[in-house]
């Protein structure tokens, strides 16, 4: 790596869909590599595939990057000196470079119709060959070209691949790579409507924006030799470095597909479910990387410090949603109570009923139990609004009907009634006093108190549940179950 050259990486999505976990990982790794090397991270939008662009596609990319706290040094929202940062605003630049290649006879006009090209493609497949352009238009004379232009026959511009050579690069993830030009075709660089193709526009952008390193998914491996060939023809991007990240697979071993609607894999999904951005960044960091000390919980700052592109795996990496949930739960546990309340509160959609006014205590009750904030709604319902019947709970735990259990609950009620201050510490003292007075412990102590006071056989920390329910409701609940026992 040239120590005197400023490291500049880029994330260059197309606004053809929502922000996918694969694209987000690419953005993160580019950000980490740049920041580890005191460089710049640039975001630009490659929107020249106009027919596939979706509404709000650009916003989904930029706003969700911001939510993840991956802040670019330059982007359409905070432009620097090397814009524009949206390709459709750069069309004259591409046209100029394409005309340069045409003038230097490194590109040529192609008048072939889509129907002709499709016919040739099918014939190649039928003959067992890889479809390639047959260079019909490369041999056109100047007079033939002039006649076609005069007759307004549409044409695209194709780049002429040099024959009988090899294109090589040292991939910082995969090592030495080599592709013979016999495996390539002459690619279209400018469509008949004047719109550049991906492989042409991207090299112009990378040069103009002084990009030093291109880190992207392995699906771009087939694009790299074309981009290197165009770079060489234009005499640009001489020292640019490529790195191709491993594919992300699902638990069945198949490549992650955006069409698999059963698997949530868009950043918007995680955001709406109530995952924290810190947890998602942490999870993405581990998609292809691991730490030498097996540490799995990282902050973004720690990820920058520890990032080493040479340790990125070349093998497929598995998207494990349960692992993401575990990482998220660990990040919630590390949050301060006030930060957790602020984060989780907007996700509470259940009618809190008698719990209103105790929202903060209710939210904190489940801090150590959730992977994403929306889960709190079900836990609130389960804990406070879905009581079990006395008959049902006694069927599971018959000892709850015994006389000594009834006496334990009466002691518990009496202790609560005499309690001067209603707080969690005092409630814990009451439970301890019941333990000493009755000689009960473990399940024989805590299960009756939980069931009689909350009408639920399981839930979060008992003293906290009792505190939130309130003295009057707890005593009322306990007495109603005693009545069901014929007391």
UniProtKB/Swiss-Prot annotation:
Catalytic activity: tRNA(Glu) + L-glutamate + ATP = L-glutamyl-tRNA(Glu) + AMP + diphosphate
Recorded GO CC terms: cytosol
Principal location: cytoplasm
Subunit structure: Monomer.
Entry-linked NCBIfam families: gltX_bact
Gene Ontology MF terms: ATP binding; glutamate-tRNA ligase activity; tRNA binding; zinc ion binding
Motif window: 'HIGH' region: 13-23
Motif segment ('KMSKS' region): 255-259
Sequence positions that bind ATP: 258
Stated family: Belongs to the class-I aminoacyl-tRNA synthetase family. Glutamate--tRNA ligase type 1 subfamily.
Protein name: Glutamate--tRNA ligase
Alphabetical list of Pfam families matching this protein: Anticodon_2, tRNA-synt_1c
Entry keywords, A to Z: Aminoacyl-tRNA synthetase, ATP-binding, Cytoplasm, Ligase, Nucleotide-binding, Protein biosynthesis
Gene: gltX
Coiled-coil segments: none
One BP annotation, GO: glutamyl-tRNA aminoacylation
Protein's cellular compartments: Cytoplasm
Purpose: Catalyzes the attachment of glutamate to tRNA(Glu) in a two-step reaction: glutamate is first activated by ATP to form Glu-AMP and then transferred to the acceptor end of tRNA(Glu).
Assigned EC number: 6.1.1.17
PROSITE patterns: AA_TRNA_LIGASE_I
């Amino acid at each position: 790596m040239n120590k005197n050259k400023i490291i500049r990486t880029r994330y260059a999505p197309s606004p053809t869909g929502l922000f996918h976990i694969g694209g987000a990982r690419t953005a993160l790794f580019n950000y980490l590599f740049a920041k580890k090397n005191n460089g710049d991270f640039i975001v630009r939008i490659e929107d020249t595939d106009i027919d596939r662009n979706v509404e709000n596609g650009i916003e989904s990319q930029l706003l969700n990057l911001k939510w993840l706290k991956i802040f670019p040094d330059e982007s359409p929202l905070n432009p620097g000196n090397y814009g524009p940062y949206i390709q459709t605003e750069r069309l004259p630049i591409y046209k100029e470079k394409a005309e340069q290649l045409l003038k230097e006879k490194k590109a040529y006009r192609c008048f072939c119709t889509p129907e002709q090209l499709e016919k040739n493609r099918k014939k190649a497949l039928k003959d067992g060959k890889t479809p390639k352009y047959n260079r019909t238009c490369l041999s056109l004379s100047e007079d033939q070209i002039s006649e076609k232009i005069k007759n307004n026959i549409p044409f695209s511009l194709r780049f002429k691949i040099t024959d009988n050579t090899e294109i090589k690069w040292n991939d910082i993830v995969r090592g030495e790579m080599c592709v013979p030009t016999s495996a390539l075709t002459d690619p279209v660089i400018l469509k008949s409507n004047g719109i550049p193709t991906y492989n042409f526009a991207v090299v112009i952008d990378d040069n103009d924006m002084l990009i030093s390193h291109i880190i992207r998914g392995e699906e771009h491996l087939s694009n790299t030799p074309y981009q290197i060939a165009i770079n060489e023809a234009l005499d640009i991007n001489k020292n640019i470095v490529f790195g191709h990240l491993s594919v992300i697979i699902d638990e069945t071993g198949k490549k992650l597909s955006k069409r698999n609607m059963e698997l949530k894999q868009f950043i918007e999904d995680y955001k709406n479910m109530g995952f924290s951005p810190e947890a998602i960044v942490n999870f993405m960091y581990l998609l292809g990387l691991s730490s030498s000390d097996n540490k799995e919980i990282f902050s973004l700052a720690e990820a920058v410090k520890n990032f080493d592109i040479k340790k990125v795996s070349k093998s497929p990496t598995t998207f494990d949603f349960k692992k993401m949930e575990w990482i998220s739960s660990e990040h919630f546990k590390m949050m301060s109570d006030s930060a957790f309340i602020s984060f989780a509160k907007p996700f509470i959609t259940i009618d809190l009923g008698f719990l209103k006014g105790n929202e903060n205590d209710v939210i904190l009750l489940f801090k150590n139990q959730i992977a994403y904030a929306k889960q709190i709604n079900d836990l609130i319902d389960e804990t406070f609004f879905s009581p079990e019947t006395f008959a049902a709970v006694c069927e599971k735990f018959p000892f709850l009907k015994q006389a000594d259990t009834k006496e334990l609950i009466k002691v518990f009620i009496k202790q609560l009634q005499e309690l001067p201050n209603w707080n969690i510490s005092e409630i814990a003292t009451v439970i301890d006093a019941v333990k000493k007075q009755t000689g009960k412990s473990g399940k024989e102590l805590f299960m009756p108190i939980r069931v009689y006071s909350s009408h639920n056989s399981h839930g979060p920390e008992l003293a906290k549940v009792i505190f939130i329910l309130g003295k009057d409701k707890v005593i009322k609940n306990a007495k109603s179950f005693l009545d069901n026992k014929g007391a």
